[in-house]
């Protein structure tokens, strides 16, 4: 039996250590959020299209040669950057992102040819792919119980940075009379400062997939291990002899779990929305500034529109958190309605030759997309482990990038149809209209099945349990607990999404 004095002495020693740890992670989170804010301060980003046209690049070169390089290179670097982010434990990829931004703005300031601008797009695609490092980094700093709050802090820092950057750029251009060249010089200065901040970030000791040595040292197992603990885990050396490496075994189990979860109707639905709607959304944001310049070459309120759309996106995303309906029944109808609204807004963009209509419709278009992003995030994550969430979001992003790359190759690239921007927007309108009709027909079929079975009988889709829920229910029954299982919902943010949001110029993706 431990004497009372020794217990009190031990508790007295533990309290200062806990206070130091609390102050330490709070400082790390604050520093990371400050870095995320400063990394978004690029006031020249909203004015890149006017800048390129002032540098004597033609609208055809910008539309059919320079911009198409962005989705091509993004598709090429997406998977390598995703793997390197986890393997190198985040910090090196954040430094790489800042270095790539430096290269982007040096090429903008010093480049004189189409090839230089295409190389600029390649470096920008690296910054887009590297956004996953920022959103994932914060989860390695805190305990799972703090994920939701820390994710909101990091997201708010990014949105605030995008908003301030857009407002600053518009004020400098409209009131200060600063040229777009000088605006890009100011952006380069902010980027160099954010690069210096990235060098002092703490490199985590662990990551989600590759750096899992903490398991050997007695740390908590991953969520997949908790879901399927098995009869017992062999010693590390024995496991290495049996499977080669612990990493290979972990990835195999993840893929196996992913195959089981594919049968969930809600998961399939929202993943399909993510792929198809994201592809169309980013195609619009890539080319919308070219459309504005053609509609009215005199007015230049790109920064103000970016700021307004960012603010509305934050409001709609916040509002989505309070929507409480039976998603198993109404998901398809909600998706169809939002996509139909997007189709109507795209139609107004290219059909009504008024720059203010173009501005307003784009702000509403971004807000409509951002309204469904948090809903889709929760619907996908609500019955998956944290590891599977990261994998599913990565696959969704890759498929969306592949789709928009294919559309770009056919519609925009000079080696394809090489259409002008108004013709492209007409095709994008048909794209969103087709998606809305498909979703509406799908929702109608579900509604007919629902009323044929009787209003008081739930849909079969809503009754299906995910593998995670099955495992939780099995464990509950074994323990004699007959209560209904309540699967946890890990709070993960997509690439974000950043916020995969955007630069409302050639590459609004970095601000979404």
From Swiss-Prot:
Transmembrane domains' residue ranges: 30-50, 63-85, 90-110, 115-137, 152-176, 182-200, 267-292, 301-323, 330-350, 354-377, 392-415, 424-448
Record region (Required for substrate-binding): 400-412
Pfam families named in the record: Folate_carrier (PF01770)
Reaction equation(s) it catalyzes: 5-amino-1-(5-phospho-beta-D-ribosyl)imidazole-4-carboxamide(in) + (6S)-5-methyl-5,6,7,8-tetrahydrofolate(out) = 5-amino-1-(5-phospho-beta-D-ribosyl)imidazole-4-carboxamide(out) + (6S)-5-methyl-5,6,7,8-tetrahydrofolate(in)
Matching InterPro entries: Folate_carrier, MFS_trans_sf, SLC19A1
Gene Ontology biological process terms from the UniProt entry: cyclic-GMP-AMP transmembrane import across plasma membrane; female pregnancy; folate import across plasma membrane; folate transmembrane transport; folic acid transport; methotrexate transport; organic anion transport; positive regulation of cGAS/STING signaling pathway
Localization per record: Cell membrane; Apical cell membrane; Basolateral cell membrane
Chief location of this protein within or outside the cell: membrane
Modified residues (N-acetylmethionine): 1
Bias (Basic and acidic residues) ranges: 500-512
NCBIfam families per the UniProt record, alphabetical: rfc
Family according to the record: Belongs to the reduced folate carrier (RFC) transporter (TC 2.A.48) family.
Protein name (database record): Reduced folate transporter
UniProt source species: Rattus norvegicus
Gene: Slc19a1
């Amino acid at each position: 039996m431990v004497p009372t004095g020794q217990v009190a002495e031990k508790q007295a020693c533990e309290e200062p250590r806990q206070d130091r740890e609390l102050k330490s992670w709070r400082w790390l989170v604050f520093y990371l959020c400050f870095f995320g804010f400063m990394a978004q301060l690029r006031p020249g980003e909203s004015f890149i299209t006017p800048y390129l046209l002032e540098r004597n690049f033609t609208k055809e070169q910008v539309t059919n040669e320079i911009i198409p390089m962005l989705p091509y290179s993004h598709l090429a670097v997406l998977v390598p950057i995703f793997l390197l982010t986890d393997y190198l434990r985040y910090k090196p990829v954040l430094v790489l992102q800042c270095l790539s931004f430096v290269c982007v703005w040096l090429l903008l300031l010093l480049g004189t040819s189409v090839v230089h601008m295409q190389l600029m797009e390649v470096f920008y695609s690296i910054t887009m792919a590297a956004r996953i490092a920022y959103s994932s980094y914060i989860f390695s700093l805190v305990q799972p119980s703090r994920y939701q709050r820390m994710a909101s802090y990091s997201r708010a820092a990014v949105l605030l940075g995008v908003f301030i950057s857009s407002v600053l750029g518009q004020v400098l251009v409209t009131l200060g009379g600063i040229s777009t060249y000088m605006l890009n010089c100011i952006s380069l200065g902010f980027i160099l400062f954010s690069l210096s901040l990235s060098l002092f970030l703490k490199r985590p000791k662990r990551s989600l997939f590759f750096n899992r040595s903490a398991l050997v040292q007695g740390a908590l197992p991953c969520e997949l291990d908790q879901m399927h603990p098995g009869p017992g885990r062999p010693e590390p050396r024995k496991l290495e002899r049996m499977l080669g490496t612990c990493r290979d075994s972990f990835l195999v189990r993840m893929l196996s779990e992913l195959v089981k979860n594919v049968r969930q109707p809600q998961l399939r639905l929202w993943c399909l929305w993510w792929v198809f709607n994201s592809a169309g959304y980013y195609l619009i944001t890539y080319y919308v500034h070219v459309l504005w310049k053609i509609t009215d070459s005199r007015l230049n309120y790109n920064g103000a529109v970016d700021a307004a759309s960012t603010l509305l996106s934050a409001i709609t995303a916040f509002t989505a958190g309070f929507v409480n309906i039976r998603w198993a029944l109404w998901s398809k109808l909600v998706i169809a309605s939002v996509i139909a609204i997007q189709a109507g807004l795209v139609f107004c963009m290219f059909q009504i030759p008024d720059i203010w209509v173009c501005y307003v419709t784009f702000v509403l278009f971004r807000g409509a997309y951002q309204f469904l992003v948090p809903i889709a995030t929760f619907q996908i994550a609500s019955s998956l482990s944290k590891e599977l969430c990261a994998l599913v979001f990565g696959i969704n992003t890759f498929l969306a990038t592949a789709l928009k790359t294919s559309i770009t190759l056919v519609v925009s690239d000079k080696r394809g149809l090489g259409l002008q921007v108004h013709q492209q927007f007409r095709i994008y309108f048909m794209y969103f209209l087709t998606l809305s009709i498909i979703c509406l027909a799908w929702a109608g079929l579900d509604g007919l099945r629902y009323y044929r079975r009787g209003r008081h009988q739930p849909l079969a889709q809503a009754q299906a349990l995910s593998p995670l829920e099955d495992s939780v229910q099995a464990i509950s029954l074994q323990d004699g607990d007959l209560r209904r299982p309540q699967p946890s919902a890990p709070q993960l943010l997509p690439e974000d999404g950043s916020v995969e949001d955007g630069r409302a110029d050639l590459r609004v993706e970095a601000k979404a």
